[in-house]
A protein has these predicted regions:
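Conserved active-site beta-strand-loop modules that form the wall/rim of enzyme catalytic pockets
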Residues: 127-134, 172-177
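Metal-dependent nuclease catalytic cores that hydrolyze phosphodiester bonds in DNA/RNA
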Residues: 1-131, 138-140, 151
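Short, solvent-exposed aromatic-acidic interface loops
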Residues: 135-139, 182-183
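Metal-dependent nuclease catalytic regions and adjoining charged, substrate-binding loops involved
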Residues: 5-6, 144-158, 163-248
Length: 248
């Protein structure tokens, strides 16, 4: 029997109900049929290949409700930033006239991405049009970004930005990247110049992952030790290292 006098019991119950609802919604969503540009910067091509091929994650590695709530926080933060940017005088466009999100598709639609927005005008000191991308980060991650800048601190996000700049032909002006500190609500902004070499490497990587998957070839793992931090955090750690018995 539930103890209604216990705040911890009530908290656990409500959290569990919310998480179940979020997990149900996620399960009902149609899975991507393409390789997302937002993921191409991950360190391990094999993990990226598992993700693209929709390989089942290891038992117990499904996204917990708490992580889904963090994802939801990011969406809500983005909506707030859109309003704040517009109130600050930026002419920020986030959808086409028909309501669809701006994006691109390449490689017969098997590589695709959707951007947060395009800023077509606004205050002095910026060049327009400019790609706009926004993230919501915990304080530790945000501080690291502030200290080391996007390319070093968040290489996945950096790859995402330059790919969008390339495929949407927004490469002539620096992207405007913003990040909200979820704890303090501080806002970090960085002007991100186009990196043609990185965009080409990421585009080549997409083709490599798609081609290898079509051919049934398993790409090399990025690390040689299953206890490496990246491997321990990977949703396919067990699946990947079981392959070693097959000489792969």
């Amino acid at each position: 029997m539930m103890d209604f006098n216990s705040s911890s019991s009530i908290s656990c119950q409500v959290s569990a109900l919310i998480d179940a609802g979020l997990q149900k919604r996620q399960a009902e969503q149609r899975p991507r049929s393409y390789l997302g540009a937002s993921r191409l910067g991950v360190s391990c091509e094999r993990a990226l290949q598992y993700e693209f091929a929709k390989a089942p994650v290891d038992p117990g590695r499904e996204h917990p409700g708490r992580l889904l709530r963090i994802f939801e926080r990011g969406h809500l933060s983005e909506e707030s930033m859109i309003q704040w940017m517009r109130q600050a005088g930026f002419d920020l466009r986030t959808t086409k006239p028909n309501g669809e999100q701006f994006g691109f598709a390449a490689l017969d639609g098997r590589l695709a991405g959707h951007i947060d927005g395009v800023i077509v005008g606004g205050p002095d000191g910026f060049k327009y049009p400019a790609l706009w991308e926004n993230k919501c980060l915990g304080s530790k991650s945000w501080r690291d970004l502030e200290k080391n800048k996007l390319a070093i601190s968040k290489p996945i996000y950096h790859a995402q930005v330059v790919l969008y700049q390339a495929y949407l032909e927004l490469h002539e002006n620096p992207a405007i990247f913003t990040a909200v500190n979820a704890d303090s609500m501080e806002i970090y902004t960085e002007l991100v110049p186009f990196d043609a070499a990185l965009a080409q490497r990421m585009s080549d990587r997409a083709l490599k992952v798609i081609s290898a998957t079509d051919a049934g070839e398993l790409l090399a793992r990025a690390y040689q030790d299953p206890t490496h931090f990246e491997c321990r955090m990977c949703s396919w750690q067990d699946r990947c290292w079981r392959q070693i018995n097959d000489g792969r």
